[in-house]
Design a protein with these regions (language model features):
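Conserved TIR/SEFIR loop-to-helix hotspot centered on a Trp-containing motif
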Residues: 157
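Hydrophobic secondary-structure segments that place a key small or acidic residue at a functional site
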Residues: 160
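Nucleotide and nucleotide-moiety/phosphate-recognizing core
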Residues: 2-154, 164-179, 186-191, 209-213, ...
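Acidic, Ser/Thr-rich low-complexity intrinsically disordered segments
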Residues: 241-245
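Short, electropositive alpha-helical surface patch
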Residues: 189-207
């Protein structure tokens, strides 16, 4: 579906949510109001632009899975499950337009490196008039064990340069949800860049796949129901997983 067709089909929709995926890059999701504005509980002026999921992907990355790609893989899983094709460039990002359930979304992956990923996020959020609290950032987290998820309604940058860039281009604000996927910490004195770009073991790959499968369901829940208490069900039975409010 082209952007123009999506805008025509959903011209009465108004953007209210934004989901971004940031590993060493950032991916982004935009979600409009539901037919019944009360279901979203947010004030938003009707806007002629259409909102979909947006996914950005850096073409310089290898096809092999490496820790720093886990955020992009999360968005790729969403695009595969929801049948959203990424075929348009906007604001230095590769975007795909479709829907999750009955909610039109834009999946996005910035084409720039991590330190500059906010250059895509800021303009997209402004263009689609997305409230800050409806921006969902998905990214890798070294402070969490491999394959462990963490969901928060807001937070700081945690020394993550991709998140820093995003906050910079959102006027320094931090009140947007985060969806972190653990990639484990540095073993010993290993160089960080080497660690982030190394191929992972089969065991670690299985852990990540399980997290991605669970993450797709979590994102779908957030898009359709909001970032509420039901998200905690994705954290059951795992010591390091938690829904922090």
């Amino acid at each position: 579906m082209t952007l123009s067709k999506a805008l025509e089909k959903h011209k009465w929709w108004c953007p209210t949510s934004l989901l971004l995926s940031s590993n060493h890059f950032v991916a982004l999701v935009l979600v409009p109001l539901l037919q019944n504005p009360l279901e979203v509980n947010v004030a938003c002026n009707i806007c002629p632009k259409k909102l979909q999921y947006i996914i950005f992907k850096n073409p310089l990355l290898s096809k092999a899975f490496i820790p720093s790609k886990v955020g992009f893989e999360m968005i790729d899983r969403v695009s595969q499950e929801e049948g959203i094709v990424l075929n348009t460039i906007q604001s230095k990002a590769l975007i795909g337009i479709g829907s999750i359930g009955e909610v039109p979304v834009v999946l996005a992956k910035p084409q720039s490196y991590m330190n500059f990923s906010g250059e895509s996020v800021g303009p997209l959020a402004a263009y689609y008039q997305v409230p800050l609290r409806h921006i969902i950032l998905v990214y890798d987290e070294m402070s969490l064990p491999n394959g462990i998820l963490r969901l928060q309604p807001k937070g700081g940058h945690g020394h993550h340069n991709g998140v820093k860039s995003m906050m910079k281009h959102l006027d320094g604000r931090r009140e947007f949800p985060r969806f972190c996927i653990g990639i484990g910490n540095l073993p010993g004195t290993m160089d960080m860049k080497a660690y982030l770009l190394q191929k992972i073991s089969d065991t670690e790959r299985k852990q990540v796949d399980a997290a991605l499968d669970q993450g797709v369901e979590a994102i779908r829940t957030v898009v359709l129901e909001g970032f509420g208490s039901r998200i905690s069900r994705f954290n059951i039975g795992q010591k390091y997983k938690y829904h922090k409010v």
